[in-house]
Amino acid sequence: MDALELKNIVSDGLLSFPVTDFDQNGDFNAASYAKRLEWLAPYGASALFAAGGTGEFFSLTGDEYSDVIKTAVDACKGSVPIIAGAGGPTRQAILQAQEAERLGAHGILLMPHYLTEASQEGLVEHVKQVCNAVNFGVIFYNRSVSKLNVDSLQQLVESCPNLIGFKDSSGQIDMMTEVVQTLGDRLSYLGGLPTAEIFAAPYKALGSPVYSSAVFNFIPKTAMEFYNALRNDDFATTQRLIRDFFLPLIKIRNRKSGYAVSMVKAGAKIVGHDAGPVRPPLSDLTPQDYEDLAALIATLGPQ
């Protein structure tokens, strides 16, 4: 799949980041992970991100990273494209991107470089080196200390033909509006805030109708229902789900730092697709929080 094909795929539909399965010792469980992807693939996501943020990318060793990507590619071959997370320091990001390409992934999401702050000039060079190291499509993840301004993006799209997407987790609507108005259809634009459904309508209004859904991991039917309602301007359905499910979900998520991932793994366990524990420094939900989440999920009915 070339970069343009990937751009077309991620320009429409719902995206998701499967959690990464660990056994009770905290080791990667390839068999369980493959079953998870086989369960999720038929629900209709346009692409799945392996080893993304929700997939605990930050906690994977080099060998585990390769195992996760290979398992995802093999499990979803012929059914749904796999986009691999890749990031950290520039040379590490390059090695991961090249490994993902070698293993058959269809592109990468370029994760933040972590810790150190960087100038726009430094970020441009970072992205450029990663893009130049591979042939497939690259989606830039705009968040944390890794945020590009419009001028920097303009430079990159002119010099990196395989930079095909911009995923925003900043929540800065004015910035996103300027990016979309300036670059037009040169890039695909993805919403990437936690519990993205809450922000999906304003992002759609400014020209970014695609987003990645964390809840697709445990309520895929409802996640697709919400996306289709949003796509069809079914305001009554989106508002009902926001009021009755997503706002209460956010209240549980906000009880502890790191619950954005822990809650998703708990949800998967509740619906019968246990992915094992999260790895430190994350912590699993408390028993009370787990019970509250289970009660909330039960209101949605079978998935």
Swiss-Prot record:
Q: In which pathway does it act?
A: Carbohydrate acid metabolism; D-glucarate degradation; 2,5-dioxopentanoate from D-glucarate: step 2/2
GO biological process assignments: D-glucarate catabolic process
Q: Which Gene3D superfamilies match?
A: Aldolase class I (3.20.20.70)
SMART domains membership: DHDPS
Q: Supply the InterPro entries for this chain.
A: Aldolase_TIM, DapA-like, Dehydro-deoxyglucarate_dehyd
Report keywords, A-Z.
Answer: Lyase
Enzyme Commission identifier(s): 4.2.1.41
**Which reaction does this chain catalyze?**
5-dehydro-4-deoxy-D-glucarate + H(+) = 2,5-dioxopentanoate + CO2 + H2O
Q: Which domain of life, per UniProt?
A: Bacteria
One of the record's GO molecular function terms: 5-dehydro-4-deoxyglucarate dehydratase activity
Q: Which CDD domains match?
A: KDGDH (cd00951)
* Cross-referenced HAMAP family: KDGDH (MF_00694)
Homology family: Belongs to the DapA family.
Stated name of the protein: Probable 5-dehydro-4-deoxyglucarate dehydratase
Q: Which organism is it from?
A: Acinetobacter baylyi (strain ATCC 33305 / BD413 / ADP1)
